[in-house]
Curated annotation (Swiss-Prot):
Annotated spans, Disordered: 1-37
Keyword Metal-binding part of the UniProt annotation: yes
Cytochrome b5 heme-binding domain segment(s): 71-147
Skewed-composition ranges (Polar residues): 15-29
Record GO terms (molecular function): cytochrome-b5 reductase activity, acting on NAD(P)H; heme binding; metal ion binding
Coiled-coil intervals: none
InterPro entries noted in UniProt: Cyt_B5-like_heme/steroid-bd, Cyt_B5-like_heme/steroid_sf, Cyt_B5_heme-BS, Cytochrome_b5/Flavoprotein_Rdt
Lineage: Eukaryota, Fungi, Dikarya, Ascomycota, Taphrinomycotina
Pfam families in the cross-refs: Cyt-b5
Organism: Schizosaccharomyces pombe (strain 972 / ATCC 24843) (Fission yeast)
Sequence similarity: Belongs to the cytochrome b5 family.
Protein name as annotated: Uncharacterized protein C1F12.10c
Presence of the UniProt keyword Repressor in the record: no
PROSITE patterns associated with the record: CYTOCHROME_B5_1 (PS00191), CYTOCHROME_B5_2 (PS50255)
UniProt keyword terms in alphabetical order: Heme, Iron, Metal-binding
Length: 147
């Protein structure tokens, strides 16, 4: 059986991989070579020590990152006051989170969150992170309910 795979010189034969070409006419795939695809989900590099694993460890530590002792009712007016890098609150599905500590951990960069600081970010969050459990991700950052 080994002889089948050896050439007359005793070396393994070099096999050529056949080149298969699919013409656009025989394919249902549309090609858009003229315009490059704009990918809004571009990941940025985070600083060492600020990976999602590091964030998970911080959350698991139980440290209160919300800035409040216990959950409070938050009005839209109060939410709007917290829109800086040092004091960044967002609302997702009726819950308000202080995401100031999370900013350097966000894979797409801080600006993506800061663009929605002080506002209800449910729609944009669901557009890009529908599969993410924000309650678990931000449980130690929970400020209260949006009223």
């Amino acid at each position: 059986m080994v002889a089948l795979f050896k050439s007359s010189l005793g070396r393994p034969e070099q096999h050529q991989t056949p080149q298969i070409r699919i013409s656009p006419a025989s394919s249902n795939v549309e090609h858009s070579e003229k315009q490059p695809r704009r990918d809004f989900r571009v990941k940025k590099y985070v600083a060492p020590g600020f990976s999602q694993l590091n964030w998970s460890k911080l959350v698991a530590s139980g440290q209160n990152l919300s800035g409040v002792e216990k959950p409070i009712p938050v009005t839209k007016e109060e939410l709007a006051k917290h829109k800086t890098k040092e004091d960044c609150w967002i609302a997702i599905r009726g819950k308000v989170y202080n995401v100031s500590a999370y900013l350097p951990y966000h894979p797409a960069g801080q600006k993506r969150i800061l663009d929605y600081a002080g506002r209800d970010a449910t729609v944009i969050f669901m557009k890009f992170h529908a599969w993410v459990n924000e309650e678990a991700l931000l449980k130690t950052s929970f400020v209260g309910f949006l009223v």
